[in-house]
Amino acid sequence: MHQGTCHCGAVKLTLPSKPEVATACNCSLCRRIGGPWVYFEFGTVQIEGHPENTLEYIQGDKTLRTVRCRTCGCVTHWEPLEPKPGAKHGVHLGNFDPELIASVIVRKFDGANSWKFFDELPSTNESPPQGEA
């Protein structure tokens, strides 16, 4: 198991397995938060210190809450407001050891416009779009 924490240690995350692939998204929220996300089946990530040490942000279509530590402010994860079968937890990989981060392949995702991975889009010489999705 792989464990990580927010900066102050008030929120601890334990992953059920080593992630192989992470996603770097350019949507209006993720590009501000920065860092890659890894995904696991909802309920399989152990989270200590939540909700007592966290604050949440709910925006847009009001289906997800983005969670951060109330002390140090580090974003730790997101979770569905109403988990359904097949729901996922998004975990911010920046809260884990650099060795784990370096071992994970990061795919860039166009959450601002096409809702596809950039490596699946037609090749162009233009810079990736930076919309306000």
Predicted regions and their residues:
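A short Gly-Trp-Pro
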Residues: 1-5, 10-133
